[in-house]
Amino acid sequence: MARVKRGVTAHAKHKKVLKAAKGFYGRRKNTIRIAKQAVEKSLQYAYRDRKNRKRNFRALWIQRINAATREHGLTYGRFIDGLNKAGIEIDRKVLADMAVHEPQAFAALVAKSKASLEYLKNTTPNAFESAVA
């Protein structure tokens, strides 16, 4: 059986790791043993933070919507409740974008939300009043 030399394969693997470690600080960028650990850890961080990015953006959208609805005298929770009761299904990303770039359209949505909340408040009897009567 012929002898197998793995110099080419090992060199290619090392180059791949060092390429991924480009831009790292200190020996993490040019020492293969340390670079391999640093690249592995960076991939773990990347995986974790791809999940966190979704949470962070949703929180940012909610903050923007809340700020915009409070300018119109409504809280975020009441606004979303009003939209749901009005049958308007717009996701938070679009709502936040509308709040920033199209204030008139957003104001119309707030008005619809308020109207649906008022309508339901006037038509639905209060639980306390019905219990007393």
Curated annotation (Swiss-Prot):
Which residues does UniProt assign to the signal peptide?
Answer: none
The cross-references to InterPro entries, in alphabetical order and at most eight, read: Ribosomal_bL20 (IPR005813), RIBOSOMAL_L20_CS (IPR049946), Ribosomal_protein_bL20_C (IPR035566)
- GO MF annotations for this entry? rRNA binding; structural constituent of ribosome
> Keyword RNA-binding on this protein?
yes
Q: Which domain of life is it from?
A: Bacteria
Q: Which GO terms describe its cellular component?
A: ribonucleoprotein complex; ribosome
Which GO terms of type biological process are on file?
ribosomal large subunit assembly; translation
Q: Which controlled-vocabulary keywords does the entry list?
A: Ribonucleoprotein, Ribosomal protein, RNA-binding, rRNA-binding
Q: Which CDD domains match?
A: Ribosomal_L20
Q: Which Pfam families match?
A: Ribosomal_L20
* Tagged with keyword Ribonucleoprotein: yes
Protein function: Binds directly to 23S ribosomal RNA and is necessary for the in vitro assembly process of the 50S ribosomal subunit. It is not involved in the protein synthesizing functions of that subunit.
Family according to the record: Belongs to the bacterial ribosomal protein bL20 family.
Q: Which PANTHER family match?
A: 39S RIBOSOMAL PROTEIN L20
Q: What is this protein called?
A: Large ribosomal subunit protein bL20
Organism of origin is: Chelativorans sp. (strain BNC1)
